[in-house]
Amino acid sequence: MYWKDYYDDDQPIIYVAGPYNAPTEMGIMDNIRKACEARDDLVVAGWAVVCPHANTANMDNENPDIYYRMDVKILARCDAIYMLHGWENSPGARMEHEMALEWGITVYYESGGVPQRRASADGLSKFA
């Protein structure tokens, strides 16, 4: 097995954004589950996916600023962001949406379906 067999420099990176916190522990787990389901759908569609919900699941939730700082650095390196249903009610997801717009990162919304990665005539991947 050789790493170059798996590296695709043209594969776009997409960031999953949506609610994390909820009034109950079960609500938080449900939000993590929804984000991970979206992550899985995006992987199947051909994206390299960053899902912060999975990165911070079950971690100390007392100081979200630590995670926001980490997420901002990761989002800055992404080609696109995928906004889950309910993102408008999440302070963190609203911040990520605003950053994506300011930085010119392509924004997709769950209501529009999973964006498909497609090949162009020259064989390079493009956003669908």
Language-model features: where?
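Conserved catalytic or regulatory cores that recognize and/or transform ribose-phosphate-containing ligands
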Residues: M1-A128
